[in-house]
């Protein structure tokens, strides 16, 4: 492969990433001479674009079609990073190594096999390790469900270690001396992963999912490096958080027709603070910084921050906000630089107020009010049919509440986090039925079951709803006693008699 100068771009964090990327691509700002005539339906056909997720791939396809003057085109190949097409190996001699990979083990099979190894673990502890517990018995795992719970965590740890290309052998030396004895308990437990589990995988001719994904990505790296494709190859939106992905991005940046578009590289952080991000992996203020991953990626590619071209299409106010966020998130060791902002005209109170005039703070009394406030803001934002709105939150409970509040307004929100099977209506009905049977007398579960929208009881919905409200008011509010499904009619009659005999003032 001919070594070329890496081509890297960045789209500011205050700009919608995919629309800005699509616009730059169609305008020919990423790959010289590509796509040529953007109105040609075949102009994009021979390009390959890697994006972080399947959702991003679907969104980019829609955006490219919308931006095409003819509203139709043969789209480029758009792949999620880490989701390498194994079937393509059948038609490409350069990826013959893919045939030698063992297929990944299924999630359920892995959990059950790990649980079977964990279940007898406490019986295999050496005497000197058991002595650490004193008179207490080693009670973990106590049940099969405990073993499955531990298996789930152990599987997650395996995926994390293999994703980061870490070595299990390094675990033995990381504990301080005063914890070394207790650390042996942990190491003994991890023998399940380091000694027993590889034997099971070898016996079954299977591999761990993370290791299998890494091997596929490394195969793609070798293919691109040894046999560069004829068309453009672009990686968009990746931070290279996975070592294998970082290497793939690095190779793409050096392809003759390759380019990498980064999301929100900080161009305002001073050199001292920027270099601090790569000085140590042990400082929480550095590896927890939002730019830490991008700093490592640029190091892996072998370029400086100044070599990255910024695709800028921002208003003055958004540019000021970008600087404010950069200053607010600078590493703690460099916050003394804030004193220098006093002479910066863009950082004066009036300028900051003007740039933040569209930012609102809403304080609510509880989670329901919070979700309702967000839903109202989203509803107001999309009242203009030419606008879109999004809620970005790591709080899944808040997201579900907002989706529910929007449904009251007849708005079907697209929740990218999806829904657990246990949370769909049919599953909640089944869960409530089981709970009322195995936990008789719980009025909350019983009322939730009676009020469930999928519970019909052979009548009309409005009639069932009125009956449920009557049951709640007469039988459960202000009274005592516990009722199960079996004795609910007798319990209701008794509560009616008690209510009739009370003297009302």
Each language-model region and where it sits:
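Polyanion-engaging groove/track-forming segments
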Residues: 1-505
